Amino acid sequence: NHYGYVRVSQFQSGTSASLRRQLERLEEQAGEPLSGLVLDLRNNPGGVLNGAVEVSDLFLREGVIVSTRGRTADADYTFSATARDVLDGAPMVVLVNRGSASASEIVAGALQDHGRALILGTKTFGKGSVQTILPMNNGAALKLTTARYYTPNGRSIQATGIEPDIVSRRLQFAEVPAHSGTREADLAGHLQNEAAGTVDATEAAGGSERLQDRDFEVGEALNLLKGMVLVRRQAG
């Protein structure tokens, strides 16, 4: 089995196309379809709405992705999937943390509500408001909150964020007394936020320095994927 890892650092208009190319590259390297995918949205501050909708659409066959509701009818919109799933239903785990905001929360919420992915990590930032900037005659601008984002199940993201299905906390270790001759190290791996590049992909189970060995949550996500694949195989 081959499992992919993709990190999205922000959402832009071309993020979906870039992500799809990376997935195709991973499958070419594997020589077969991926058995599962880790989608890393940690410390992703968001970006453009269309980018989040298009990325969600890559993994959903039907249903609502996100909706906006405002004080007036012209602020109400619904964005839906267009009957495609580039992974053909292969299991997914999405990594999030409190640095995951806005567009990241839209993607995580959509995949979670549709049961398409397990969300692993910590509660997200909670930025689910639609803001409009109105220019003023004096050259200044006024920023107004005109609507809010809602997940497919009608959950408001604003101020509440996305609760992960599985909460991952950094492991804390107490120092063992010196006379025992042993000492515990902090084993919680943490991959620093990478600068530049919107999408970075690699095969999670490959490479000389395996990603799951230096990033605790990626390792946990990979274990979850392996478990889900095994359960599906036994059920099938």
Where are these regions (language model features)?
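C-terminal "post-core" interaction segments
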Residues: 1-236
